Amino acid sequence: MSSVKLTEYSHGAGCGCKISPMLLDEILESTQKTSVYPQLLVGNANKDDAAAYDLGNGTSVLSTTDFFMPIVDDAFTFGQIAATNALSDIYAMGGKPLMAISIFGWPIDKLSADVAREVIDGGRSICEDAGIPLAGGHSIDSPEPIFGLAATGLVDNANLMQNDSAKKGCYIFLTKPLGIGILSTAQKQKKIEEGHIDPAIQAMTTLNKVGADLAPLESVVAMTDVTGFGLLGHLSEICEASDISAQVWFEKVPLLPNVEKYRQLGCIPGGARKNFASYGDKISEMTQQQREILCDAQTSGGLLVIVKKDGLEAFKKVTEAAGLTLEPIGETTVKSQHLVEVL
């Protein structure tokens, strides 16, 4: 393990580096005429996790990319987290990854090739866990360390998960606890106690493979992963695309250990503030605690799954087989004044 602390070389951390939802909408808004591609089943219209291109044989190719600056100090672990996060988009669409190529930026005048190799090795280890090759990539000399993947996957068209397919009257489940942004900020501010970051690292390096097993279930109607826009941001995207609203039961939302402790110490990532500024007007009134946790920018977060209430038995059979014990954190409702109501 290298003694280099990678977070000292980056201004942001993980998915907290994301451009705010509000500014991203402004950037992507274009008056340029675009062509229509009938085979493109999923593009950028509803802010889905990956693009889907119909092969004409009942399956689609999934394509996605994700990269960011270090969220942890250890190079190998950074590579693992970045790769896990990138592959999550494939699983969130109901697919399975086929291969990946790396996206790599490195400050060659500040950090050695040995440390860079550890990052790549970490990413490769996760690809091995997913059963796919890290088949190549592209690298540049950059002011800050950057790593991620461009991933390709396959999905049966019948199992393709999209943001616009949620229905009212369903339960909402989350497969990983929240608080990654708060704990990683505590680490960056050197306030974290020994061992307290470990549960976050465990969560961030756990692949969301269960998504591919959940997608074929008739009771699972929509799915996305919770990353840089926080739980409320990604749930809002589903509600907006599906023309519904949702309730979140705050006391039922799972949290990583010690999140509240570091929240009270002021370890709030800038991404949480950017998130609330972007979509806070679409959410019901919240306490400061609710706002700082539910808008917390996650890196390699869990899957947000919308499940019909009459299909819970099949859903729980799959999740329990994956080692998950889940309870609903809310439900979808008919469209109302707010996209999401926090109770």
From Swiss-Prot:
Binds 1 Mg(2+) ion per monomer. It catalyses: hydrogenselenide + ATP + H2O = selenophosphate + AMP + phosphate + 2 H(+). The active site is at 15. Its cofactor is Mg(2+). Mg(2+) binds at residues 49, 89, 225. GO terms for molecular function: ATP binding; magnesium ion binding; selenide, water dikinase activity. The keyword Nucleotide-binding applies. Pfam families: AIRS, AIRS_C. Keywords: ATP-binding, Kinase, Magnesium, Metal-binding, Nucleotide-binding, Selenium, Transferase. One of its GO terms (biological process) is selenocysteine biosynthetic process. Gene3D superfamilies: PurM-like C-terminal domain (3.90.650.10), PurM-like, N-terminal domain (3.30.1330.10). Its EC number is 2.7.9.3. It comes from the Bacteria. The record marks 18 as: Important for catalytic activity. The keyword Transferase applies. ATP binds at residues 18, 46-48, 66, 89, 137-139. GO terms for cellular component: cytoplasm. Synthesizes selenophosphate from selenide and ATP. Belongs to the selenophosphate synthase 1 family. Class I subfamily. Homodimer. This is Selenide, water dikinase. The gene is selD.
